[in-house]
């Protein structure tokens, strides 16, 4: 908590805080573009079996009697239960007798059929090329589209573990810059992948870097923020997701080839990597990790960028050591290991509850976000609506962070999310508008709850173990994200089953917030001792105290 007093010695850092937050937010937009990429690159177009008499260019009119395309389709492809051409079967031999039925429904159950042994013909109106058309991920292989989404989310799960550990050890800025370069390289290579296996491997590596980027971006913003800027800073760090999803819909609408789309969202990372050298390391992290000289250097840089010309006079090593005396003494001690953290009942309880609530929210969040094709016919419009409602939720977040209790607001939002998801089950496919409204409302509730959860998680965990704890939370969140696309495979057995799973978890997790402490308008904990002192003296800070009031700026 003494770090806030140290920032007071540095003067008003609002200019630096805004500039660094804006830079990180712009970079985060590029990161979020990768999250929902498979909504378009793995789009499943309409398809049917390739048949010789219909699709072979060498077949002449003499062979077919100049029959129309509809007639040739009728004798070559059987109809499914909805009287539409089958997607995965064809007649072994042309059924010429079907030409003379005059509109009656044919009985083709006795006709010999076979799978699409010669491949498929795809409807390329929506997309000229996707990974589905590239590697024929349809029919028996259609579940591989969920696998493609799963491997990216699995990479995010691993990134949540590695990112937190490496960030605590090497610093926020170093991990950020490394991950920018990693996404640039593996994302570009994914566009040129010759096989589905190589593509999935590269997307896995992209997921590792993407999660580390998001986690470290939020931490870097939060750890430089004064109390007055804390809520707005975290909110600005979350806004890029909505902007990115709307941007992705526009890019996918303009670029219908998955190779080019993959390149467009990956190549800019080379520029981001070069420009990220402007970012400053977290002075709070440096001081807490017993590097006061380096922390002082970063503080002076921040003060200079905010226009403070006398930073060297107002910020000295003596002032830093006297202000942060307790924190520096704590830094001399060995950091708690993961096993030691598990023996801290209160910290362990908080991490467990945060992890479960994040798991439930992310299961629903990605269940909606990764399956826009299951919710509406126009994936471009629905993705844009999703992005808009996420952005709106993030705009509402500063008000919610300032005026609403953390626990009550998150509990209500999770209940709303559960209701929307479970209601989708009872809305027929024909009522597309209502399904889209419910999905959009549910996603907005999930996005707002997610922003509040990031703030709440930062507020209940001390700085010295915050990155590690957030890494654990991110791991559970990304386990849910990885499982979300796999849940859709269960629709083969029962179409409502995935949506039941998506809806039940948020409902249960809503009650878990009652077990977490209320942290609105309270400063961040820097050490384990700060957290213990707060439990011994849990007095609410006065609202009029400018040091602890959370305002928009």
Swiss-Prot record:
Changing residue 393 to V: In a breast cancer sample; somatic mutation. The keyword tRNA processing does not apply. GO terms for biological process: hormone transport; organic anion transport; short-chain fatty acid transmembrane transport; sodium-independent organic anion transport. Residues 528-553 are annotated as: Disordered. Its main location: membrane. One of its GO terms (cellular component) is basolateral plasma membrane. It catalyses: butanoate(out) + estrone 3-sulfate(in) = butanoate(in) + estrone 3-sulfate(out); propanoate(in) + estrone 3-sulfate(out) = propanoate(out) + estrone 3-sulfate(in); pentanoate(in) + estrone 3-sulfate(out) = pentanoate(out) + estrone 3-sulfate(in); dehydroepiandrosterone 3-sulfate(in) + butanoate(out) = dehydroepiandrosterone 3-sulfate(out) + butanoate(in). Specifically expressed in liver (also at protein level). The keyword Cell cycle does not apply. It is a multi-pass membrane protein. It is found in: Basolateral cell membrane. It holds the Pfam family MFS_1. Residues 37-143, 199-203, 255-259, 370-378, 429-436, 491-495 are extracellular. Glycans are attached at residues 39, 56, 102. Residues 1-15, 165-177, 225-233, 281-350, 400-407, 458-469, 517-553 are cytoplasmic. Keywords: Cell membrane, Glycoprotein, Lipid transport, Membrane, Transmembrane, Transmembrane helix, Transport. The chain crosses the membrane at residues 16-36, 144-164, 178-198, 204-224, 234-254, 260-280, 351-369, 379-399, 408-428, 437-457, 470-490, 496-516. Belongs to the major facilitator (TC 2.A.1) superfamily. Organic cation transporter (TC 2.A.1.19) family. Sodium-independent organic anion transporter, exhibits high specificity for sulfated conjugates of xenobiotics and steroid hormones such as estrone 3-sulfate (E1S) and dehydroepiandrosterone sulfate (DHEAS). Can transport the statin pravastatin and may contribute to its disposition into the hepatocytes when the function of OATPs is compromised. It is specifically activated by 3 to 5 carbons-containing short-chain fatty acids/SCFAs, including propionate (propanoate), butyrate (butanoate) and valerate (pentanoate). This is Organic anion transporter 7.
